[in-house]
């Protein structure tokens, strides 16, 4: 069985940070080929966070990501999972459509941004969010969980955009472990 995991980082949250590093490691352990995307250093150091500021950054990231994926023979894979964080969640959902992979991809969305929520009705997958995420209002997180209970992987009370609580290293490690265990259940 041929399997692929594509890793979509956030703005400052690169593929070497804990949530993406360990989810990619688990996918590799389960026999998935790993593609780690890079949007460019200017995007990884971008400081804007409002939807208006993020929209052109997302478009630029997609423009830079498409060439990294255009020669991937997606039809040859038996299972494809998009593992994403922050703006990567919106990029992953948009690319599922742009690459004509609707229904062929499992989405694993960590700390989605508000623009990702509109895709929840169309995806096959799970999302994970913290209630103290400064980029996602808590009310939107709970509404998404109510509207899409089968797509809610976990809501982390009091956790920020990295699914951590300041000053609680052991709690952060526990959250990473819980997320990796959820991913492991999705992998074939």
Predicted regions and their residues:
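Catalytic histidine-centered segment of alpha/beta-hydrolase-like enzymes
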Residues: 159-174
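Acidic catalytic loop of the alpha/beta-hydrolase fold
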Residues: 131-136, 161-162
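Short alpha-helix in the alpha/beta-hydrolase fold that links the catalytic acid
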Residues: 20-21, 136-146, 168
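Primarily recognizes the serine-hydrolase "nucleophile elbow" in alpha/beta-hydrolase
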Residues: 63-122
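Short beta-strand/loop motif that positions the catalytic acidic residue
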Residues: 121, 127-129, 133, 141
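Active-site nucleophile loop of the alpha/beta-hydrolase fold
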Residues: 10-11, 39, 107-116, 130-132
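Serine-hydrolase catalytic machinery in alpha/beta-hydrolase-like enzymes
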Residues: 2-76
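C-terminal alpha-helix
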Residues: 178-188
